[in-house]
Amino acid sequence: MTEKTIRLTTAQALVKFLNQQYIEVDDEMAPFVDGIFTVFGHGNVVGIGQALEEDPGHLNVYQGKNEQGMAHAAIAYAKQKNRKRIYACSASAGPGSANLITAASTALANNLPVLFLPADTFATRQPDPVLQQLEHESSAAITTNDGFQAVSRYFDRVQRPEQLMSALIRAFEVMTNPASAGPATICIAQDTEGEAFDYPVEFFQKRIHYLNRQIPTKRELTEAARLIQASKTPVIIVGGGARYSDAREELIALSEQSNIPLVETHAGKSTVEFDFKNNLGGTGILGTLAANKAIRDADLVIGIGTRYTDFTTSSKTAFGPATKFININVSRMQTYKLDAFQVVGDAKATLAELAPLLKGYQTQFGDRIAVYKAEWLAERTRLQNTKFNREAFTPEIKDQFDQATLNEYADSLQTEFTQTEALITINDTVAPDSIVVCSAGSLPGDLQRLWNPAVPNTYHLEYGYSCMGYEINGALGAKMAAANNQEVYSIVGDGSFCMSHSELLTSLQYGKKINIMLFDNSGFGCINNLQMANGSDSFFCEFRDSDNQIMQVDYAKIAEGYGAKVYRANTKEDLISALEDAKKQTKTTLIDMKVLPKTMSEGYLNWWNVGVSEVSNKESIKQAYEEKQTNLKNARLY
């Protein structure tokens, strides 16, 4: 071979290659990799660290504070950019890389592209066992990074410099393919990072990854149109694939043309703004009454870019036994679910092709869509105005805490604020284009039901993995991806705050303002609801000390110690005042709200299959098990 070469270390070649990756969608081209998050340590600081110091190119380098936290920021960046731009994540060997594994799981569950670069042990094995290396008697080849194999869409190891080339090409094919988008992991041996090789210059030429919109076959479109025309009450489930495809206009056009209601998954919510007349909001276990009524009525469900998780299907009890399905998805695997008619294609392109075939078709919903929506808005108004009293208060989550316990919480937390009133107050006060970020606990349920996005692509929920700690760290990534001056609000419970808030400091370090709305009910409230609803007593889900006293934590003081602007708000009036002042700030803010437990919203027309104990001495658990068995009779088996 006489091709021209350039001598680089493996790490230098990696950085040079990342700078040359571009993505083109609908004739618009942009760099695919915008930067890299890293926590330097032994294993990456003298390899990838040296390469980035010497010549980062256009890559922005951010110093993370916890590997999982920074990776969640990278995931949120890709999500907010609709999978069209990414960040890479580099971590040191051993525990640093192990910290990335949970985040890789989050990316995989949500089909979000991130390039993970965990450092590995020595390829030569000369100094083995090195600091932070695991030793297995069965194999010297097993390292911490083998844990990534189960949570990566693509996994590879680089132990020779020339292996980098094929590894990167495979990784970028996976990350830029809508059907397989997800995390790619390339483990690089730490001695290999610094080894040099004469790389062919052509390997570093500008590479454009084309995101072509796949159009279904004529057979698929014709049969899908026939099934819709034969139905009386079809409903469209708007999944994340519809959002990533930018299918808003096509969804509105088809819904208006044929009077088909739209219901949403967490990933699909805000693809179409809430005030569109046929948008009934979130569906499933955390859905609105309106959406779940429409799904109950449906004789045909058109799933667009959805994975049909149990929270979308109410553990496969949401649909009638005769309901049929059409699944439109770029992933052929996803189209097979629920014995659906399979349409493999891009959501936006498919809807554009399908709409002309349905001209003249009208559903039989009539004015039911408007009636359902009006009923739901009245219920939302009720939830906005819930007020605590010390004599005979009935919370939304009934029959779990008695009045004395609720009064104890009111006294200890010095609050009478309900969670639903606080959340809707935030929705009504922030700017319409604000991005809201959340992931775990009871707040995703309140958000899917009660948060009304006025602007598309402003609802950012990680609910594929529902990973506690994503909320604040993900808010940083969303802010990095947001338009100038677009505010980002992290909606987080005290449980998730304690789990991880590392990148709060990073947001202050780099001037990326986020607003943290901290709901403190002194416990893991969501899971407490679940355990008590299934017959157990309240057991290790409340934050109580060894004397059984409710814990009182000043979370505002914690954030203030980092340098954030903080507020305390236990009333609607104080919350509005804090929100308005926070808008004027240029650095990260935190509003510490004490809210009463059991005041989050409850479900509507839903059921969740969980592993209730079949054998117990408690009658309440026996009853919960019998109720589960009864509900399973109404569930599809697959």
Swiss-Prot record:
It comes from the Bacteria. Involved in the cleavage of the C1-C2 bond of 3D-(3,5/4)-trihydroxycyclohexane-1,2-dione (THcHDO) to yield 5-deoxy-glucuronate (5DG). Mg(2+) binds at D494, N521. InterPro entries: DHS-like_NAD/FAD-binding_dom, Myo_inos_IolD, THcHDO_hydrolase_firmi, THDP-binding, Thiamin_PyroP_enz_cen_dom, Thiamin_PyroP_enz_TPP-bd_dom, TPP_enz, TPP_enzyme_TPP-bd. It comes from Listeria monocytogenes serovar 1/2a (strain ATCC BAA-679 / EGD-e). Its EC number is 3.7.1.22. Thiamine diphosphate binds at E67. This is 3D-(3,5/4)-trihydroxycyclohexane-1,2-dione hydrolase. Pathway: Polyol metabolism; myo-inositol degradation into acetyl-CoA; acetyl-CoA from myo-inositol: step 3/7. GO terms for molecular function: 3D-(3,5/4)-trihydroxycyclohexane-1,2-dione hydrolase activity; acetolactate synthase activity; flavin adenine dinucleotide binding; magnesium ion binding; thiamine pyrophosphate binding. Gene3D superfamilies: 3.40.50.970, TPP-binding domain. Pfam families: TPP_enzyme_C (PF02775), TPP_enzyme_M (PF00205), TPP_enzyme_N (PF02776). Residues 442-523 are annotated as: Thiamine pyrophosphate binding. NCBIfam families: myo_inos_iolD. GO terms for cellular component: acetolactate synthase complex. GO terms for biological process: inositol catabolic process; isoleucine biosynthetic process; L-valine biosynthetic process. The lineage of its organism: Bacteria, Bacillati, Bacillota, Bacilli, Bacillales. Belongs to the TPP enzyme family. Keywords: Hydrolase, Magnesium, Metal-binding, NAD, Thiamine pyrophosphate. Its cofactor is Mg(2+); thiamine diphosphate. Binds 1 Mg(2+) ion per subunit. It is an enzyme of class 3 (hydrolase). It catalyses: 3D-3,5/4-trihydroxycyclohexane-1,2-dione + H2O = 5-deoxy-D-glucuronate + H(+).
